[in-house]
């Protein structure tokens, strides 16, 4: 079975354990496939924003690649944190590395939930931030996420709650 998705890497296409990967190459594991931090296999996600759970893209530059799983696949879902369609495979091909501009443009037309998860985990530069604020200026959910996660406005949700309480009493 083939399944396409995304995999995040440290700069230089290395994983969290220091293993280097190359575009166009296929990698296989030995031993039984198992999802998790102490697992065995190559993790990837169906949606790009879910890869940000595994790499600190708010603090450091990362690379995100399109990948294809070519072997056995194990699926994992974390309903508590709303992470779905995360996978682990015993055989993966690194198809290509996405350019930053591609990543930014991918989320200019996604639903609120996906955009909010993206801005929660991927540090936008000032020009990208201005673009997102322009595109989503009438979308209070996305604008609040931008204010909180990108601009560090830790009171944005409290202000919104106070406004709602005031409106209910009038």
Where are these regions (language model features)?
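Short, glycine-biased loop/turn motifs at secondary-structure junctions and
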Residues: 1-170
């Amino acid at each position: 079975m083939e399944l396409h998705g995304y995999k995040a890497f440290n700069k230089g296409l290395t994983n969290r354990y220091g293993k280097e990967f190359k575009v166009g190459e296929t990698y296989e594991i030995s031993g039984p496939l198992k999802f998790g931090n102490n697992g065995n296999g190559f993790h990837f996600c169906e949606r790009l924003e879910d890869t940000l759970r595994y790499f600190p893209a708010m603090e450091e530059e990362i690379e995100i690649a399109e990948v294809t799983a070519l072997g056995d696949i194990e699926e994992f879902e974390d309903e508590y944190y709303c992470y779905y369609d995360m996978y682990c495979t015993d055989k993966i091909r690194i198809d290509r590395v996405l350019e930053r501009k591609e990543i930014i443009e991918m989320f200019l037309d996604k639903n609120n939930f996906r955009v909010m998860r993206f801005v929660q985990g991927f540090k936008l530069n000032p020009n990208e931030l201005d673009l997102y604020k322009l595109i989503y200026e009438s979308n209070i959910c996305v604008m609040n996420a931008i204010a909180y996660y990108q601009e560090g406005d830790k009171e944005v949700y409290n202000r919104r709650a106070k406004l709602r309480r005031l409106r209910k009493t009038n």
